[in-house]
């Protein structure tokens, strides 16, 4: 069987690796428009902010390793058309050579693309997006310029907040804009997000929330020099757009069933409306256990799992995805936040009737006074069924990072907040208290 994979990042690589390791003997072709593969974009801000010296280790797979296993790798090759009826992929190389690859099974792993705000001046020099490695290189080069002193970041989600930190670490003045009233509004309720807002402000980042960009203006050399919002005009030397991503599904959007944002609709086997076409990662929908329906959640962790599921099903073993919770985390200037499932705001927007329980305590036992940080927790649950549908944690302690995984499993297994209240959680003073803050938050649920 011949399998063509379009896209060589997390989802495409996971699909190919699963096939190679579990179901050998197939002919595999991987195509990507970039010159590299397997770039961990989540590390861009860490590298650009000089928390690591070089970006080399942000790549975890090489073309030659796949080629050694018999895979045909076509990088710097742009797919122009897919003939789904005749099962053919049409592409063109960097040197304009035309390529036609027939397939028995096709895997679309084309990922997501930045949302480009349609504003006057959007094409000016000095306005950047941040997703691909080469975009990270461009921003890194801009940060190295002495004349680039004042940077505007539009969008205070994870990527925007992280690159704002990176710019500050490089000694820049940073203005962080978002139309919402807080940072991280897609993942956390306002009471939690404000903790990050305070952290950002304490580290010298100028916050402009509840502000909407309207226009970019240029200097005499054609570089962006001002950003105009609904409230004021600001002088800037560089703009980084981080307002979000949408599915990169143009190759198939008019032939396959799609979600409201253009993502390719798939079932729990990652199979599209065409039984010989699978879609994985950011280009596809995914089943949310919190929502109990298919939705769109673009995360690298989801991409890897969806690729594994697709690989098994293509290889001949029927395997259903168990669904996801959208578990995520962020660490900015030593302040850590993690969440999973739905926030109260998100749940209400989706029409769910929910309640929540908040609690705050020290991470370790009360008699340990050194390196014992406060932890805030919120558990979100359906009011009637009491099924847990979300959780949020915030602290300077890194221990919270592991705790969110327990809530992820609770959501997946449809556990109630009352069951959580009596869950056997270990106690050791170095790590927690006998009355664990997760236990107390659950016990306090009304």
UniProtKB/Swiss-Prot annotation:
Gene Ontology MF, one: NADH dehydrogenase (ubiquinone) activity
Cofactor list: FAD
Active site: 10, 42
Cofactor: record remark: Binds 1 FAD per subunit.
EC number: 1.6.3.4
InterPro entries with a match to the protein in the record: FAD-bd_OxRdtase (IPR050260), FAD/NAD-bd_sf (IPR036188), FAD/NAD-binding_dom (IPR023753), FAD/NAD-linked_Rdtase_dimer_sf (IPR016156), Pyr_nucl-diS_OxRdtase_dimer (IPR004099)
In-chain residues carrying the UniProt-annotated modification Cysteine sulfinic acid (-SO2H): 42
Binding site for NAD(+): 159, 178, 187, 244, 298, 329
Residues engaged in binding FAD: 7-11, 32, 42, 79, 109-112, 131, 158, 282, 299-301, 427
Top enzyme class: oxidoreductase
Keyword annotations of the record: FAD, Flavoprotein, NAD, Oxidation, Oxidoreductase, Redox-active center
Keyword Nucleotidyltransferase appears in the UniProt entry: no
pH dependence comment: Optimum pH is 6.0-9.0. Below pH 6.0 the enzyme is reversibly inactivated, above pH 10.0 the enzyme is irreversibly inactivated.
Regulation: Inhibited by hydrogen peroxide, sulfhydryl reagents and quinine, but not by EDTA.
Highest rank taxon of the organism: Bacteria
Function: Catalyzes the four-electron reduction of molecular oxygen to water. Active on beta-NADH, but not on alpha-NADH, beta-NADPH or alpha-NADPH. Under aerobic conditions, oxygen acts as the electron acceptor. Under anaerobic conditions, DCIP and MB can replace oxygen as the electron acceptor.
PANTHER family to which the protein is assigned, alphabetical: NAD(P)H SULFUR OXIDOREDUCTASE (COA-DEPENDENT), PYRIDINE NUCLEOTIDE-DISULFIDE OXIDOREDUCTASE DOMAIN-CONTAINING
Family: Belongs to the class-III pyridine nucleotide-disulfide oxidoreductase family.
Subunit structure of this chain's protein: Homodimer.
Annotated NCBIfam families: NOXase_Strep
Name by which UniProt lists this protein: NADH oxidase
Annotated organism of origin: Lactococcus lactis subsp. cremoris (strain MG1363)
């Amino acid at each position: 069987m011949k399998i063509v994979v379009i896209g060589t990042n997390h989802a495409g690589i996971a699909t190919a690796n699963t096939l190679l390791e579990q179901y050998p003997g197939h002919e595999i072709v991987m195509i990507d428009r970039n010159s590299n593969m397997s770039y961990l974009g989540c590390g861009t801000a860490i590298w650009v902010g000089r928390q690591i010296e070089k970006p080399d280790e942000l790549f975890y797979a090489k073309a030659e390793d796949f080629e050694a296993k018999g895979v045909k790798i076509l990088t710097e090759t742009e797919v122009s058309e897919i003939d789904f009826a005749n099962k053919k992929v049409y592409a063109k190389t960097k040197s304009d050579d035309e390529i036609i690859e027939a397939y028995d099974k096709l895997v679309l792993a084309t990922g997501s693309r930045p949302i480009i705000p349609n504003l006057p001046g959007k094409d000016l020099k000095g306005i950047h997006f941040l997703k691909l490695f080469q975009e990270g290189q461009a921003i890194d080069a801009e940060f190295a310029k002495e004349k680039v002193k004042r940077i505007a970041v539009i969008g205070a989600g994870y990527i925007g907040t992280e690159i704002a930190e990176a710019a500050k670490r490089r000694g820049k003045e940073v203005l962080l804009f978002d139309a919402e009233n807080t940072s991280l509004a897609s993942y956390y309720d306002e009471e939690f997000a404000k903790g990050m807002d305070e952290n950002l402000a304490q580290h010298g980042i100028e916050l402009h929330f509840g502000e909407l960009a309207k226009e970019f203006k240029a200097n005499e050399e054609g570089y962006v020099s001002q950003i105009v919002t609904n409230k004021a005009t600001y002088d800037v030397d560089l703009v980084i757009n981080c307002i979000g991503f949408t599915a990169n599904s143009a190759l198939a959007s008019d032939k396959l069933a799609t979600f409201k944002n253009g993502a390719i609709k798939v079932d729990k086997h990652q199979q599209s409306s065409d039984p010989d076409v699978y879609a994985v990662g950011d280009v596809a929908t995914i089943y949310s256990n919190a929502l109990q329906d298919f939705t769109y959640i673009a995360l690298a962790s989801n991409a890897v799992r969806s690729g594994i599921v697709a690989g098994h099903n293509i290889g001949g073993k029927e395997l259903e995805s168990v669904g996801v919770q959208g578990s995520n985390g962020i660490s900015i200037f030593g302040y850590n936040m993690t969440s999973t499932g739905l926030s109260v705001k998100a749940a209400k927007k989706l029409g769910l009737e929910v309640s929540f329980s908040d609690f705050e305590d020290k991470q370790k036992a009360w008699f340990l006074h050194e390196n014992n940080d406060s932890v805030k927790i919120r558990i979100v649950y359906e009011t009637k069924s009491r099924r847990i549908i979300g959780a949020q944690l915030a602290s300077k302690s890194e221990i919270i990072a592991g705790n969110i995984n327990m809530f992820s499993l609770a959501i997946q297994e449809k556990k109630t907040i009352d069951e959580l209240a009596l869950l056997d959680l270990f106690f050791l003073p170095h790590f927690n208290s006998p009355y664990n803050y997760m236990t107390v938050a659950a016990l306090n649920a009304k």
